[in-house]
Structure formats: C-alpha cells, structure tokens
C-alpha cells in the first residue's frame, strides 16, 4: 500500500519519543525528591504512582550499575566500583534505556565518556569502553558455524568474484591508545598483574596505537591483536569489499595465508561467497 512504510516509520518514531519521555519523567522525579512530573501524574493515580516512584528511586541506581557493569567490566575496574556507580547513574539520567532488555542499553556510553569533562585525564577510557562494548555485543550475537565446504571457492574463483563472510558480531576496534594491552592487564591473575601493569604504564608513556579484532570462541568473546595491514584487510571485509579489493587495501605487507590460519583457529570466518553482482 503506498505510504504504508512511511506511516509505520512515523508510528515507530512516535513510540520511541513517547518511551523516551516516559523514562525522563521517571528520572526527573527520581532526581527531585517529592516532585512528580505532570505527564506521570496524568498516567498514574496518586498512591500507585508514589509507590512505583519510590521503588524506582530505590532500584534505579543499582539497576544502572549492574547493567552497565556487565557490559563495561574493564572500565568499571579501571575507574573503581564507586565512581562507576556514579557514572552509571549519570548516564541513566541522560540516556535512559528504551527497551526492557537492558543488555541492549549502553551503546552510547563510550561516546558519552569521550565527552565527559571529568574523564579528560583518561583520554584512553572511551576506547577501552568501545572494546568492552564490542566484546559484549559479540557475546550476544547470533550463533553460526563455519561453512567449511565454501573454502574450496578460493581455489576455483577469481578473487574479484569472491567475498569472505565473517562470523556474526565480529568487531574491529582501532585506537591511538594501547587498548589491547590495557584490557589484557585487567584479565590476568593477581600474581602476574604487577608486570602487566608495568607494560601498560610504558605503553601509555609513549602512546602506541593498537587495533584488535573481537570474535567469539565457544561462548566467550576474545580479543585478537592485529597489525596495520590486517586491520585494513578486516575493515575492507566488514565494509563488504570483494576479496581482490580487500587484498589491495591491505597492501603488500599482508599475509593472507597467515590470516586465514588465524581466522579458522579463532572462529573469525563464517565462509566464502561468490559475488552475484
């Protein structure tokens, strides 16, 4: 029906705006003791609204801390539990969740951290948050298995007629900061931590850019360091480039055979597809 898609989009946008305003009404009441926004008063009777609002006040901070802490575990460890709780509450206030699944909330958190004045002394924190988010999203991505038979296309087709398909949720993060080194230091046992954090301090003293690929191995998302050619190659694949174009973007320093071996062992690759265009 002509115009049906437009009407559906308008309805969805209206619902999103309505939910955002509802969350902000609750947050406004949460922040100002004894107040209740007009829109909320109109939707709820006095006693019922007061009880619901009190429950919201009691639980919102804990909910925000748990939800963001699950997705941004490294950042939480870096800033400390108390400071992270304050950040989570502040973020909830400005970017309230719009869906019931709080696992989907927080995609704006890295960018929000990058603009936060109090975090200016930690210029690498936002990129660490981006890595945390990539790991979180990867573990929530759809399951998939390697189409091993499709690898035979590499022997029978011109590279310009093939595309490599990465596993769902595979992510690429490139940073001017040593994000892989920082992340690693926060994952290891306490008896090895001193040496790992010394490496972090050295890396931050002379900032070294690092690129990582995030892929799930079994049930856990894993961080894999990439060099420059590997990162350029991976970005081309994520952009949908054919094999020939991706090889050109990676440059002469790229070792395709070596990458393919890592991709198969690390479960990065879903399969090879012949281009239809």
How would you describe each model-predicted region?
Residues 2-145:
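N-terminal, charged low-complexity regulatory/assembly segments
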Residues 1-2, 213:
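N-terminal cationic amphipathic segment used for targeting or macromolecule association
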Residues 94-221, 225-228:
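Hydrophobic packing positions characteristic
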Residues 219-277:
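C-terminal structured interaction module
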């Amino acid at each position: 029906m002509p115009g049906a898609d437009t009407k559906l989009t308008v309805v969805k946008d209206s619902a999103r705006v309505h939910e955002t305003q509802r969350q902000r009404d609750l947050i406004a009441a949460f922040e100002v003791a004894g107040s209740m926004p007009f829109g909320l008063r109109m939707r709820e009777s006095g006693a019922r609204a007061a009880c619901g609002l009190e429950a919201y006040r009691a639980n919102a901070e804990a909910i925000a801390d748990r939800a963001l802490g699950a997705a941004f575990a490294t950042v939480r460890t870096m800033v400390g539990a108390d400071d992270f709780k304050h950040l989570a509450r502040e973020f909830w206030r400005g970017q309230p969740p719009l869906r019931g699944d709080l696992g989907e909330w927080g995609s704006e958190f890295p960018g929000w951290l990058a603009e936060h004045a109090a975090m200016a002394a930690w210029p690498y924190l936002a990129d660490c948050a981006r890595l945390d988010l990539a790991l979180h999203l990867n573990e929530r991505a759809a399951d998939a298995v390697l189409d091993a038979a499709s690898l035979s296309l590499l022997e029978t087709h011109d590279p310009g007629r093939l595309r490599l398909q990465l596993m769902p949720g595979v992510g690429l993060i490139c940073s001017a900061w040593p994000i892989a080194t920082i992340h690693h230091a926060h994952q290891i046992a306490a008896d090895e931590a001193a040496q790992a954090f010394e490496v972090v301090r050295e890396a931050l003293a002379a900032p070294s850019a690092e690129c990582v690929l995030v892929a799930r191995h079994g049930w856990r998302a894993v961080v894999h360091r990439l060099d420059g050619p590997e990162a350029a190659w991976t970005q081309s694949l994520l952009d949908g480039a054919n094999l020939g174009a991706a090889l050109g973007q990676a440059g002469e320093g790229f070792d395709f055979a070596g990458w393919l071996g890592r991709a198969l062992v690390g479960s990065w690759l879903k399969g090879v597809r012949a281009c239809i265009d």
